[in-house]
């Protein structure tokens, strides 16, 4: 399941993020890559332990957890501290086909998570750069994603994916992973679809409608059955 969510950050917030990031020192992005990923990764990254990266990451997590669509799609248990990368045409930056590590650990906090979902939050407008599409492969084929600044995309961390070479400008983004309460991707997809149907019924019939109440009960009982907390 690939889900795009608009306006996690406002345009004003994106501008503020970019102003701060443009003043920062960047390092080789391979510093946080696994052995296989490091062979195909060419980009720059804010130092994960920098005060700026941590501060901006906290703001992103706060915005995400306040977004109903994100919570519905991810059912998050633990969110890894967001990281920040930059793909510049001047560096021939790209990230070849790879799969994310199954487990990620944060040396600063000791947090360890199973990576169920990967998230990219775009911090550059599509017209600021050429190339730089996120390409995610699944059983239905390849999906290219290039969203407006402030929007994010969620996709299963088990997916093969890549970032195509940037040929003009710079692609700036935040990327991170999360562990969901719902381990199974198919179950998580059904929960998301069911929640969407319930919200549509609430708009049409009201929250107190008997059928809405019944379906809401089914939703929570499925969460109870599947959730790891």
Swiss-Prot record:
Cofactor comment text: Binds 1 Fe(2+) ion per subunit.
Cross-referenced SMART domains: P4Hc (SM00702)
Sequence positions that bind Fe cation: 98, 100, 161
UniProt cofactor(s): Fe(2+); L-ascorbate
NADP found in the keyword field: no
Record-linked Gene3D superfamilies: q2cbj1_9rhob like domain, Rabenosyn, Rab binding domain
EC number(s) on file: 1.14.11.-
Residues where 2-oxoglutarate binds: 171
Keyword Disulfide bond: no
NCBIfam families assigned: PRK05467.1-2, PRK05467.1-3, PRK05467.1-4
Protein name: PKHD-type hydroxylase RPD_3334
Taxon lineage: Bacteria, Pseudomonadati, Pseudomonadota, Alphaproteobacteria, Hyphomicrobiales
């Amino acid at each position: 399941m690939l889900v795009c969510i608009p306006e996690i950050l406002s345009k004003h917030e994106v501008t503020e993020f970019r102003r701060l990031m443009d003043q920062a020192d960047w390092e080789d992005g391979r510093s946080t890559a696994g052995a296989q990923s490091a062979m195909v990764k060419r980009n720059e990254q804010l130092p994960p332990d920098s005060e700026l990266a941590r501060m901006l990451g906290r703001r992103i997590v706060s915005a995400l957890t306040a977004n109903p669509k994100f919570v519905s799609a991810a059912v998050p248990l633990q969110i890894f501290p967001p990281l920040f990368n930059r793909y510049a045409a001047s560096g021939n930056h790209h990230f070849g086909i790879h799969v994310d590590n199954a487990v990620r650990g944060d040396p600063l906090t000791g947090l360890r998570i199973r990576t169920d979902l990967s998230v990219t939050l775009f911090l550059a407008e599509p017209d600021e750069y050429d190339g730089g599409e996120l390409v995610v492969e699944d059983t239905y084929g390849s999906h290219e994603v290039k969203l407006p600044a402030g929007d994010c995309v969620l996709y299963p961390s088990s997916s093969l994916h890549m970032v195509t070479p940037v040929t003009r400008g710079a692609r700036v983004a935040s990327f991170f992973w999360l562990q969901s309460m719902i381990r199974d991707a198919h179950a998580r997809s059904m929960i998301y679809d069911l929640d969407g149907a319930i919200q549509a019924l609430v708009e049409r019939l009201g929250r107190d409608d008997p059928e809405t109440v019944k379906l809401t009960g089914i939703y929570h009982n499925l969460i109870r059955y599947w959730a790891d907390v």
